[in-house]
């Protein structure tokens, strides 16, 4: 059981506190990755968890809840949310990497 996801946008935090398109967007847009719905492990070109000390699923997702996973890299964390509760085959995701890619959004199947 896994999601296959494609990156649509990458955002970074601006000095004025707003979100802006990240310099990483050009290289990451259109990239894909897979997420284990059992372990929260992410494999692919972007936001991989290979070097994480641990990964875990916080919420498996349901008709009412999003799928949520977290990766602990020791000195930073990464979170991922997929709107599992939407009743359609393609579901939006958002990921936040503290000290990493920033905020990544897109679609999962």
Question: Which positions does each model-derived feature cover?
Answer:
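Short, surface-exposed coil-to-beta transition loops
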Residues: 28-29, 74-81, 100-104
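Short, exposed beta-strand-loop hairpins at the edges of beta-sheets
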Residues: 88-103
């Amino acid at each position: 059981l896994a999601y296959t996801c494609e990156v649509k946008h990458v955002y970074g935090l601006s000095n004025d506190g707003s979100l802006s398109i990240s310099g990483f967007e050009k290289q990451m847009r259109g990239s894909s990755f897979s997420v284990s719905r059992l372990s929260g492990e992410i494999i692919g070109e972007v936001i991989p968890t290979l070097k994480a000390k641990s990964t875990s699923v916080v919420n498996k997702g349901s008709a009412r809840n999003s799928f949520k996973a977290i990766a602990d890299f020791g000195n930073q964390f990464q979170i991922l949310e997929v709107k599992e509760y939407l009743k359609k085959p393609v579901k939006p995701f958002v990921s936040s990497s503290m000290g990493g890619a920033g905020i990544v959004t897109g679609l999962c199947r």
